[in-house]
Amino acid sequence: MEITFDGGKIISAHVDGHVIMTDQPVDNGGKGSAPAPFDLYLAAIGTC
């Protein structure tokens, strides 16, 4: 796994050929271009 900081508040996790992006909502200084990290965390727990 590799984690990259892609500018602004966008962070990507590169896992086994997949890219999982996160961003903050607009009202929290992000662009809202991807799920917020905590939302993605909850989705990961829910899909275990």
Can you describe what each PLM-predicted range is?
Residues 1-43:
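Extended beta-strand/beta-hairpin segments
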